[in-house]
Amino acid sequence: MKKQNIPEEILSLLTEEEINMFQELQIKIKELNNKTNITRLTDGDDYWVSQVFDSIWPFKAFTNINFDNKKFLDIGSGCGFPGLAYAITHPNSEIYLIDSLKKKTDAIKILVEKINFKNNIHVINDRIENLAHHSSMRNNFNIATTRAVSNPSTVSEYILPMLKKEGFGVLYCGKWTNEESKNLDKTLEILEGKVKDKKEILLPRNKGTRNIILIQQKRLCPEIYPRKVGKPEKNPL
């Protein structure tokens, strides 16, 4: 397949096989989008930068951490990002993709069936506030993330209960302020986590600034978290 429209910053991060899989995924998402609208980010830079690059670069940026052969959780996966992107670039990892909308999880299941992923991939239609209190899911993941735009403290309340001790949470943010940093530190103290590292990047093709906050579970999160549906959003810790 032709690669002239793919930014060089992305090509430099991927193997030939991975590029081909992302191109195949793009085709399948477009086909699916014609039947059921799951995302508007399907063409050009919207796909290659806002979907693909934004999903994979955090796991390339923290070079001192091994992200291979892990149990990975994508919360609020939407049309499958970053979970399916992580699956392509980390074929030895086991992937869980969760979304509360059945329309989205049905679409992801179709994508998983149509593309030859090497991973063991699980797609679950439920809310994280419910799943986090199931013993089969809680404290069960090496890595958890969500690209859903939300308060970092709220996202941390969803992520940390799912992590094994010393597991990593990947928080996606736009611009990062001192006030947000202080609020997150306060939340992490309650949830028994800590900030491990932070990276900032200018996304290719003028797609804006992206900050990634890498958090880590120090001790198992208190059983009462996450709180009931709606509370983490309305009243962040």
UniProtKB/Swiss-Prot annotation:
EC number: 2.1.1.-
Family annotation (InterPro entries): rRNA_ssu_MeTfrase_G (IPR003682), SAM-dependent_MTases_sf (IPR029063)
Family annotation (Pfam families): GidB
Gene3D superfamilies for this protein: Vaccinia Virus protein VP39 (3.40.50.150)
Cellular component, GO annotation: cytosol
Keyword RNA-binding set for record: no
Protein name, UniProt field: Ribosomal RNA small subunit methyltransferase G
UniProtKB keywords: Cytoplasm, Methyltransferase, rRNA processing, S-adenosyl-L-methionine, Transferase
Class in the EC hierarchy, top level: transferase
Main location: cytoplasm
Organism encoding this protein: Prochlorococcus marinus (strain MIT 9301)
Superkingdom of origin: Bacteria
UniProt-annotated binding residues for S-adenosyl-L-methionine: G76, F81, I128, E129, R147
NCBIfam families, A to Z: rsmG_gidB
Localization terms from the record: Cytoplasm
Keyword Cytoplasm: yes
Annotated function: Specifically methylates the N7 position of a guanine in 16S rRNA.
A molecular-function term among this protein's GO annotations: rRNA (guanine-N7-)-methyltransferase activity
UniProt cross-references to HAMAP family, sorted A to Z: 16SrRNA_methyltr_G (MF_00074)
Similarity-based family: Belongs to the methyltransferase superfamily. RNA methyltransferase RsmG family.
